[in-house]
């Protein structure tokens, strides 16, 4: 099973409201904040919405 390490690299301040809500729902706050989430379809779908704001790394357990 793998996890995803997600880092916010650009601010969501001037993004669409739906994108700002997605950033907040993933648990990302400020720029350079990082969260580790499970690699599943729901997470991948949310990441596609904000791909231009984040960087993603796979972590093997």
Swiss-Prot record:
GO MF entries: structural constituent of ribosome
Pfam families on file: Ribosomal_L30
Keyword Ribosomal protein: yes
Highest rank taxon of the organism: Bacteria
GO aspect biological process, one term: translation
Entry keyword set: Ribonucleoprotein, Ribosomal protein
InterPro entries named in the record: Ribo_uL30_ferredoxin-like_sf, Ribosomal_uL30_bac-type, Ribosomal_uL30_ferredoxin-like
Keyword Nucleus: no
GO cellular component, one term: large ribosomal subunit
NCBIfam families: rpmD_bact
Subunit description: Part of the 50S ribosomal subunit.
HAMAP family xref list: Ribosomal_uL30_B (MF_01371_B)
Family to which this protein belongs: Belongs to the universal ribosomal protein uL30 family.
Name of the protein described by the UniProt record: Large ribosomal subunit protein uL30
Underlying gene: rpmD
